[in-house]
């Protein structure tokens, strides 16, 4: 590291609380903190002072420009950079930045997805400063986290609905806590997203069109060794990878990102970074930044960072575990069971709300993790199934069972494990194991939503989760606020809701085929693909939910459905076209060149009176497979040409049912040819080349 003092390094490029205290007048600082804490509007005078202080600080860090940094419906971040310079009368420039420029920007909104909310010619859009997420300096620019909306006020981004959902759950959770005699002004959800990724050599990446255009390999035969030896997970870091991770930590720490854990993952070349949890909107910004920084740092080390959910067939893909909890402004974690969870009525009530939310809004949670990339993982024995269920562990299960049955609860779970060696002390045994096949698992004092794909913006999953739980808390508060006997009413409510929603709790193996049958018996949803999931965005119960909590309007929900269907279709179209190009321009010419060499060898042997049986046999196999590849590629082109163009939903189902099958048909002979054609002829690096030489 260039700086070894980590506390000094951490947040050094962030306009954080420490900097604000140093650079803002006391009254301005207090007003800004009130805005950040309570979500109140910021007045123009305060904004002007903050803007000047922010500009001066940014210049001291080497910034010459500023940008309103936002997250449109593409799921990635967007930025337009303006310099601080303002011309003076004498032909020079001054460095200026006004309160108005801080609070509001005006990017062109016509080139971002709107899902029908805006016509192409309706270009005006606005960005609005989010003061709850710190500004920072990166690459010579001051980055100001913002929300993004249209000229008519319709939301066009990921951040605004997230902030609204956080307000919704705060409002309803505070109502519940008031019933328990607690004076809480604000409740926030917190998230710690674990980020998986692949690192491959940049030279290999540059030689593969599929990786460049789609982020994943469309062809590739399995090498002799994959991940079956279990020797990569938590294995020793190779020097190049360790150097990358060290550099990554430093860059993330500068930006105030709490990078905590790093290790090798299951697949070759696969790794993970996990941060300490923080407030959800900040965690979302930080995760977007993390993915950007990963790509940048990877280039410096001669790598390319792959964030696609399934870059390589035959080995695990990458996900992103969303560790979610709820905390009060007094620091209390509402999902902390305490020493005696059976006696912690408040915790059990919040747990019940989450169980009810996950059951009633399984469709929204499934939608929030749906994508073309994640379709390769969900239900593929490497990630949770596409069926949403919950795992709460043995102790909590026993507590809920006793509440439902009315039987007395007996605590048998607090034990210690004796490891059988005198030098090793007895260690406390957790009251629950970890079920890695569960999409939504309780892990001690938080829920781990494990179905997210590695490339996804975590905002959507947390919007769904926050809003669904807010609705259940609202219903609970409405019922309990009028209760004459609060304790009896709480107990009756919990008992009723557990009985009604226990179907969502599953403790078994989610990879087992029997779970699909069992889930169907329970009436759980099974959306096998993104194409199946997205249309349920606009189910009436979901429209009602978001309208009730002021998270989305009906038009905004419809726009998100259309945007995601359109994105799904575009991704699969690009993949199909890339596959066709690679067959036509690379694989087929390579096979023909190899055939020509084989034919020359066969003819030379014949002329010399030597039998060329092996060469002739190989020539026949390669020729036959090349013909098959050519025919299947032509069929793929025909399938793509027939995609419906009048309806995104129809097109999505067509891509899933027809085009993907046609792509599989193309890949099969190509992968066989890779194992037959001489290495010097094969036109791009193979899995063996890519996965084992970093």
Question: What are these language model-derived features?
Answer:
Residues 46-50, 70-72, 100-101, 148, ...:
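Active-site-proximal loop/turn and secondary-structure-junction residues that shape catalytic pockets
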